[in-house]
Amino acid sequence: MTPLAIRGRIFVVGVPRSGTTLLQGLLATHSTTTSFTESHFFARHFSRLPGTSTAILTRNPAPGVAAFLNENGEEPVDASRWFSSENRPWLRLKPWLPTQSRTVARRLLRIFDELALRRGTPYWIEKTPRHLRYVPYLERVSNEDPRPQFIHMIRDGMEVVASLYRASQSWERPYDLETCIQRWNEDVAFSLTRVADPNDHFVFYEQLTSQPEPTLRRLLADLGLAWEPEILESYGPTTDRLVTEDEPWKADVGRPIRHSATSHRELNAAQRNRVTRLLRQDLYHEIASRAQQRAGGIAAPG
């Protein structure tokens, strides 16, 4: 019997509150995939170098690795044991960290590989929205088969801003409205730069919630995975396992798929006017148009 090998490394990225958890849960219900709670491995431990596709290690990831394993109910794997203070005392020496950036990044990816193999699946899905800006770096450090695939979740800006603004009020550092607008503008502008890359795929929240089966069929085909109708029936419990008790704003993600548009309730008229004025909604239409062209003319969201 041929040993099980990793055939797919899949990252779901995008602006928070764009539907990334919904998509993650759907994909993780496939019989050949597994997924985890948000790792934050790169966003919390690496710093991007402005104007480059490079990032450097700036924080010891060992505590984050241990917390991630505990959150997912997993015992250590070989790749995670590598981070122990006995094996790598230099991880506690901040000046040394940047020199080991590539080595550590690859070891972190290997943790996902080994967990997936332990679970008996050849594909894994990692979903941390903030990893969007680390896509170029993840490409660089993953210079081996299988090449990583990146799924960008795109949602109407007004709805994202309203949802992000509301959800962040329970965070330690809530966002003001301008921060939410800036986050959407900058992140969607970044996703737009990736439209031509063959390893990047684009899913629109409006299409996923109104036409879940054809949208998922196309995405799975692009990822090299067969369609499984059970996904739409069984994704709820899978999604629930990917949400921690510290994420109450995700509590309803595993419910039946429906389009959610709540900006008219979450924001007052003055706030909606401010969002309309500052939001670069043209980015949404541009990325939808270019994704449609790349997909061979499949209708873009309205």
Regions found by a protein language model. Give the residues of each.
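PAPS-dependent sulfation machinery
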Residues: 38-127, 131, 256-257, 261
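ATP-binding Walker
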Residues: 18
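PAPS-dependent sulfotransferase catalytic domain
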Residues: 112-232, 242-256
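P-loop (Walker A) phosphate-binding loop of NTP-binding proteins
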Residues: 15
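A conserved segment at the C-terminal end of the G1
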Residues: 21-33
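PAPS-dependent sulfotransferases, especially Golgi type II membrane carbohydrate sulfotransferases
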Residues: 1-10, 165-169, 173-174, 185, ...
